[in-house]
Amino acid sequence: DIETARNTEKDDMLNLIRSRFESGSSTLSLLKELYPDNIVYVNRSGNYVFADINPKLAASEYDKSAFARNDKGLMTYSGTNAKTYTGIDLSKHNSDVDFAKVKAAGVDFAMIRCGYRAYGSGLLVEDTSFNTYTTNAIKNNIDVGVYFYSQALNKEEAIEEANYVLTLVKPYNITYPIAIDVEAIENDSFRQENLSASELTDVIIAFCDTIKAAGYTPLIYSNLLYFMDNVELERLEGYDKWFAGYQTASPYYPYKYAMWQYTSTGSINGVSGN
């Protein structure tokens, strides 16, 4: 009868929850599994959010079941609807990099930090490894894109950042996108922390349009929390996304993206550190 069916469904659900926790699943990963039609995340206040998927935004084109790690630990995609490439994200924190070994390890491209705006002083700073990394990557037939960590407060500062980046990349053959990196500074205050979603979106658009006008492909780097809470995604539909999402077998992001950063602790021959 109906009551028996309800009790059976309840027992099945409780058994699922118990088995997931016994196997080490986190509360968040379990909630994501239980609510497949929502975007589940934890906001900056520490509260769980169950957001509806926005039908106005282009959906991801990738088959989640087609993602897998190969014998080298690198993420691969076997879907027939796209050809994928393996890349690494580098900054001065990686110290010495042997790009010949990196190329031999199967890396197709490198996203290299060219600089940043200091989150306290607001000064524009070049990454001290940018020139060396870029020169040696290109020398070893690794395609290069760049990213810049933004702390712009308005359109004018965003354009200033973009023009600074264009000056830095001018000597090089940059074949991959130029990304604006927007994310929070953990455990410290930072210039952009009080910007509204509308204001930060203005910053991103101003940066991207300046990059695009110079003949490069703009890209927006961020994580799930920032894409959901800190920008107006509908206004950013015309720009490619570089999604950072870790500890999942496939990207936990329902919307269209061009690049996925799937770990912050990866290792590859030729690079010291993560």
Show where each model-derived region lies:
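Gram-positive cell-envelope targeting signals
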Residues: 1-2, 211
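Compositionally biased, low-hydrophobicity segments enriched in charged and small polar residues
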Residues: 9-10, 102, 230-231
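Functionally critical loop-and-helix segments that line ligand-binding/catalytic clefts
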Residues: 12-87, 94, 234-274
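Surface-exposed substrate-engagement region within the catalytic domains
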Residues: 45, 53, 168-178, 182-274
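Substrate-binding cleft of extracellular glycoside hydrolase catalytic domains
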Residues: 80-204, 212-214
